[in-house]
Amino acid sequence: MATTKSSYRRIFGGNPRSSSSGSRYVTSSSRYSLGSSMRPGTSSSRMVYSTSASPAVFKSSSVRLRSSLPPARMADSVDFTLADAVNLEFKANRTNEKAEMIELNDRFANFIDKVRFLEQQNKILVAELEQLKGKGTSRIGDLYEEEMREIRRQLDQAINEKARVEVDRDNLGDDLQRLREKLQDEMIQREEAEGNLQSFRQDVDNASLARIDLERKVESLQEEIVFLKKLHDEEIRELQLQIQESHIQVDMDVSKPDLTAALRDVRQQYENVASKNLADAEDWYKSKFADLSEAANRNNEALRQAKQDTNDYRRQIQTLTCEIDAMKGSNESYERQMREMEENFALEAANYQDTIQRLQEEIQNMKEEMSRHLREYQDLLNVKMALDIEIATYRKLLEGEESRITIPVHSFSTMSLRETNLDSHPVDTHSKRTLLIKTVETRDGQVINESSQHHDDLDLDLE
């Protein structure tokens, strides 16, 4: 705020003039000095009033002449030369006063225009301040509250969605755990089935070895039977040869007993023994073969059942493996979705936090702007108050000057009469002019400092 200074100085009166009779007189002179300086928050005014004391002094706003001498006697004649000189001086002073009044009026009009302009600016600032207080803050507050509610709603939805996903994840984890336990049981059963199958295979191998051994024994028995048959046939041939030789010998020598029946009996006995041995061997072979076949059938049935169980277990394992893979894929998908949702929620929360920070910064900026407008408004109020004080001071000075200017015509005749009285009654008077300086400092419309100083400016000797 620029500092405005104004000063107003008025000087009235002139040097005392000697009349033709050689008497001396002192006219009263007055001097007013007003200065003001305005600063934001502090205003000071200084008013200097000095007057030269004489036998006739001014008192109060209406200027009246009062004499300290005894009442003057009316002279027989009036000195019109002195009155003419005083009238000329008064006219010159009136001309100067008129020019100064015109200048003062122009400055006063400029001050009034400036005050009006400042009042308009003040009204504009007050309107802007009211608008910012009424609409701007509430609108921003409503937007802020609405966005906060939306953020809270989305955050609640995200929390609920996260809880639901966690419940699904826990359920899937439980299902996966159950499937893993079931898979473990199936693997244990599979290992047991493989162990049983291995034992069955060992039994089958043993049965196969026993069957091969029995087959080898049957072959050896068959070979032995063939050998016995050959041996029996050979013995029969030998016996027949012996019998033929014995028949010949009997025929040649003597008649011997009949051996055909004996040979027949022996042959019959050997054939019976061979048939019995062959039947026993065949029965033993058949019984062993039947036992081995039954054992092989039993082992084959167990093997077939084991293979079927193994195939079933393999299919179940494949099914469970597929389900586990699907569960793993679903779990990974859910975990990926959950991570994406957490990242999205974190990003949205960061964006909302940035929005909240930006709104808070805007609110803080608007508060600072409101504070700045309030300070400017206070400064304008201080300037307006200082201008009002200065205008009031000018008004008082103008009223005082107008009331003082209305009396010079009447005072001239009085002064002329007093001069003639002084000629007839010389007086020795000592006059002293006193200078009063009063300084007042104000801030925010309150007086903070006030001081007064008295100075002896001039001493006058009146005879």
UniProtKB/Swiss-Prot annotation:
Region (Coil 1A): 90-125
GO molecular function: structural constituent of cytoskeleton
SUPFAM superfamilies, A to Z: Intermediate filament protein, coiled coil region
Region (Head): 1-89
Residue ranges of the region described as Tail: 402-463
One of the GO biological process terms: intermediate filament organization
Segments of this protein annotated with the region Linker 12: 240-262
Superkingdom, natural source: Eukaryota
Site for Stutter, residues: 345
Organism: Xenopus laevis
The protein's name in its UniProt record: Vimentin-4
Region (Coil 1B): 148-239
Record keywords, A-Z: Coiled coil, Intermediate filament
GO terms for cellular component: axon; cytoplasm; intermediate filament; plasma membrane
Low complexity: compositionally biased ranges: 17-37
Subunit structure of this chain's protein: Homomer.
Domain IF rod: 97-405
Transmembrane segments: none
